[in-house]
Amino acid sequence: MHGVTTESQGAKAPLAGAGELRVLLTADQIASRVRALGLEIARDYDGERPLLVAVLKGACMFQADLARASALDLELDFLSVSSYGSDTTAQGPPRLISDVRADVAGRHVLLCEGVVDSGRTVSYILDALGSRRPASLVVATLLNKLPCRKIEVPLRYVGFSIGADFVVGYGLDRAERYRNLPFIGIPEEM
């Protein structure tokens, strides 16, 4: 049976239909860094009620943990943008699948992204949300893939800078798999 390498014991853990993963960032490393980012955000938005917008589906776990770590009075919202098919490479320009429900005008908006690679999706979202006149609009990303950058985008809060490897776990997927893993891993078969 195929499995994934668990980060804490180095043993194989069964995961139906999955190959092996090489752990890049452990659950403890992620939790520690997200807590630090949450404290920084709490300090930066003290006295404000920011709107945390997750880019679905990849940023859902990051947004939830970041919101808890900040301990702020805040609002959560979501949007979905896609440029991917079932493959791991972009298939075209980003397109909005579902929009935020909140009115962002005059609000402090913090866009939560799981990974920023080419920068195209984040640039597209920043343009779309920026046209609605928020009081401020900044990006928090768990992972920053600088080697893949095609468009420069401003990133205010960065969890980790990583290489160009395709990664999964902690909300990030490969063909809708691996999102539920508590760590970030690199699929061995890729």
Where are the regions a protein language model picked out?
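PRPP-associated nucleotide enzymes
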Residues: 1-190
